Structure formats: structure tokens, C-alpha cells
Amino acid sequence: MAFTSMVSTVPVLFFFFTLLLISANSSSLSHNIKVQEQDKDPFVGFNIGTDVSNLLSPTELVKFLQAQKVNHVRLYDADPELLKALAKTKVRVIISVPNNQLLAIGSSNSTAASWIGRNVVAYYPETLITAISVGDEVLTTVPSSAPLLLPAIESLYNALVASNLHTQIKVSTPHAASIMLDTFPPSQAYFNQTWHSIMVPLLQFLSKTGSPLMMNLYPYYVYMQNKGVVPLDNCLFEPLTPSKEMVDPNTLLHYTNVLDAMVDAAYVSMKNLNVSDVAVLVTESGWPSKGDSKEPYATIDNADTYNSNLIKHVFDRTGTPLHPEMTSSVYIYELFNEDLRAPPVSEASWGLFYGNSTPVYLLHVSGSGTFLANDTTNQTYCIAMDGVDAKTLQAALDWACGPGRSNCSEIQPGESCYQPNNVKGHASFAFNSYYQKEGRASGSCDFKGVAMITTTDPSHGSCIFPGSKKVGNRTQTVVNSTEVAAGEATSRSLSRGFCVTIMILVTFSIL
């Protein structure tokens, strides 16, 4: 999962060049990389974790996936109710063997066969299971289980062969980026030799079976561990001038974003072990929308920017500098905020949606087809969250109607939105007034964590909320303002504070 991807760092060289160098002809580096037949086109999917206090029921969750045009998901287990609910849909599913089941499966062929029978044969093909991820970051999080990894993978594969499902369903295991060393420049990358005894036969297995190398890649952690060296814009897929592009001095290939460099590092690492025909599948990548005081770059703005640009990057099909002919598919971590996860705060804040399906923020993915309907939701509103104490809500309400310059005239005594006369109702109106005034901008519905976005019109009776379709030709009075909440302004200024690139040769650490 996300937190385990920041386990270790190693020193490497990072170059910033002011002049545009002539890129090497990357076509000579291309290889016959194998991709599953049904997934020849790159896609974006989502990880679905279940450490959520108010998660939708399986049936509701599937309806939500269909409404959002999400066609690829990765589960961290093989939940039977969810697999049943996914039957006869177009949603393609990666199911998982949790780390704590590796011992049983890796040491017993019959246990592996039983697992395939219960979790695959019982549902396929009505449920479109495309792959099995065996464990999660086993080499770096539970190294004591490493010797069981390949036996478990092979036992599961043999069980698929026995059921004649081995060509439709692939078997692999997700790795943390920290299994690679010297990842920039990518041309120098290699797998940690500690794991060669496992990686060599694993890669040979992936090559033989046409399965992908699964990698969990997080530019967020690269930035957090290398602040001041790796510019934020490079991590967020933001447009760069040539002087800010990362250049591999060995190949002269230009890298406009960190994720591409990490993917190419994986390809080079495989090539160094004489494997050149295995595709990289990014099984986790994302950016948290909230963090504690030590995580100032975990903001809604940065999460929106990263994930929106990531989606566009995948659907642009431009590949990587090393493999322009090959675009890796990506599973965003994650669909829902897992509010039950242990600290730090960011661990509970990777989701695009809250567990009840209301969006944490709205992605901006225009031009990416029908993917993610939340991008095309024209009518969204900002309301007070349930369960927030009245004192905290009152403070946020006071800011919205004061420094925030929301139009709060409708919640005054005798006006149309005064009833119900309670702080939650008044706060919702004031929050939404501010949100609409700010053009529903990313980050304008937070109020220190007590507000949330909803697609349900909160208008009631004669009380019409700003932005409502019920407004018709009614003119809403708003006050233009460039002010934002103090906390939001601080995080925004900080998040751009490390974007100045000094054109020197430096040594730094990267995942």
C-alpha cells in the first residue's frame, strides 16, 4: 500500500540542463513487450481498499463504478460479495492474495488449487477477473515471506492451467519502487541484488506467461524525500520548460515527469537481468489530499493536479521516453478515502471519494472520453459534514460569512434559508455560497476538514442554494473575492515553494 513505498532511498545523480539536447532515437530501444490481448489499449483503473467506516454495499459500489465509467479495479482480497456483484458487468478485476495467506498457498499445491476454485472458478467468466496479485510489496514489507512468493505464484498458475484459465488470467506480484537502486538516470537502474535469487526466476516466469511486472510507483514520496532537489512540477506532470526537464546523460532522453522515469527505471532493471519482453503495470500511484504538519504537500490542489494529469498522460498514449510505443496502464491509489487507516493523516486521504461516494475533489480530465463521470458533473455543492461538533462548525461558518465573504443574507432571521435554524444548516448554505463564488475551484470546499462536496442539490422548500438548477433566472448576489482560508493559502504557497530549479549537478536520494 501507499505508506510502505517510502521504505528506503539511495543516492543517485540528477541532472538539470538549460539547453535542449538532441534526444536519442528511442526506437532502437524498443522490444516486443507482451500485453494481455483484452488490454492492448492503456487504461486507468482504481484500487479499492475497505478500511472505510461507511463503505457502500457491494451492490451500491458496483452501481457507483458503472455510473463513474470505471472499468478496471484492483481489490486487496477476493471479497465474495463484491465479486458476485461485479458479475455480468464490464468491470475488469484484479483480485489479490493477502500477504498473510502466502505461507499456506506457497507451501501447498492443494491449498492453491482450492483458492483458485473458491475465488476464480466460482465467478469467472461472469465476473471478468483479469489477474491475481500475489501479496503486496512482499520483498520490502515482509521479507521473511520472500522465499514463499514464487512458489505461491507458480502454484496458483498451475491451478489456473488445470482449469484452462491461464491464458485469460495472469499472475504477478506488486513491488515497491525501493526494490530498484540508482533509479535516476533510468539508464543506470538495477534491482537490489539482495533479491536477485527471487527476481530472476520471477521475471522469467512473467516472460514465459505473458504477465506484467507490477510496480507501486509514487512520485509523491520521491518529492517528500527529495524536497528542494526534485521540482514539484516534475512530480505533478505540470508543463515544463526545456531547462526544467530531467535528462538522462547516458541516453540523452528527456523526462518531463517523475513517473515516466520510474517506469523506465523498471524496464532498464529488467533488461539488466536479461528480460526485455515484460510490460510494466503500475498497480498503485496517487497523491494524498490531506496530511499533517509534516506533510504540507498533501493537499487537494496537488492531488487533483497529479491524478488529473496522470489520467490525461495515460490516455494520450505517448509512452515513456525509453518506450514511446508502450504506455503503461495505471491503477490510481485509491477510489475511497480509508478513514480507518492508522496515522499519518495522509494514509487516510488518498481517495477521490469518501466512503459514501461523495467526491473529495473533482478531477479535471476533459478529453479523456467518458472516463470518470465526476469530471462532467456540472452541478456540485459544498455542504457541512455529518458528525462535526457545533463549535467547530460555527467557527467555519463565521469565517465563511466574514473573511470568506460568502453571501449569507439568506440565512438571516426571516429569510428563505433561515430554517432549519441550526448551525449545520446555516454552515452548509454559507459553505456552498463560498464554493460557488470561487467557481467550484479545487480546495474551495474544505473549511479545515468540516465540509464535503456533494452532487445532491441541498435546496429545500423555498430555500434555493447557489448553483442549484432550481434557481432558473433568479439572480444570485455574490461578492467577488480572491481571499482563501488561511490554512489553504499557506499550503498552496508552500506547495509551489520548491519549484525553482537551480541548474547544477547535484546528488540526491530517490525511491
Swiss-Prot record:
**EC code:** 3.2.1.39
Which GO terms of the molecular function aspect are on file?
glucan endo-1,3-beta-D-glucosidase activity
Question: Signal peptide location in the record?
Answer: 1-28
Q: Which residues form the propeptide?
A: 486-511
InterPro entries reported in the protein's UniProt record: Glyco_hydro_17, Glyco_hydro_17_plant, Glycoside_hydrolase_SF, X8
Which family would the database say this protein is a member of?
A: Belongs to the glycosyl hydrolase 17 family.
Its protein name is Glucan endo-1,3-beta-glucosidase 1
Q: Please name the source species.
A: Arabidopsis thaliana (Mouse-ear cress)
